[in-house]
Amino acid sequence: MNRRLLKRSFIWPLLLMLLAAATMIGLAVSRLPAPTSALQIRPARAGVALPDGFYVYQRLSQRGIHIKSITPLNDALVVQLDTASQRKLAETVLQDILPAGFVIQYYEPQHATAWGAKLDRERLKFG
């Protein structure tokens, strides 16, 4: 009987630790940034004006591409789209409709990479 009591006394703390670990892992995974489907349009050289956001919206909408938003950001336009497949389609459409002199590339928001940089900074404090 003494052995049974001893075994039971180890089970509950172990279960609580496993539950706490599972909760922490679940919270950490839920806080990971979601992959974005955004494109950035910027001039290839200085002095080239950005295309009008409404023009870009109209042309992409005519081709059946659903746009979440078009935002100017640091001398560029950021086009937020629904899915990665629409991002690829929008990239080819934009290359067709925009004149030469624009760079169209995948855009990842700053907050998505900021947590990695923050972890690196925190790691430096531990040693």
UniProtKB/Swiss-Prot annotation:
Residues 1-8 are cytoplasmic. It comes from the Bacteria. Residues 30-127 are periplasmic. The keyword Membrane applies. Pfam families: SecD-TM1. It is a single-pass membrane protein. GO terms for molecular function: protein kinase binding. Interacts with EnvZ. Belongs to the MzrA family. NCBIfam families: PRK10629.1 (NF007915). This is Modulator protein MzrA. It comes from Rahnella sp. (strain Y9602).
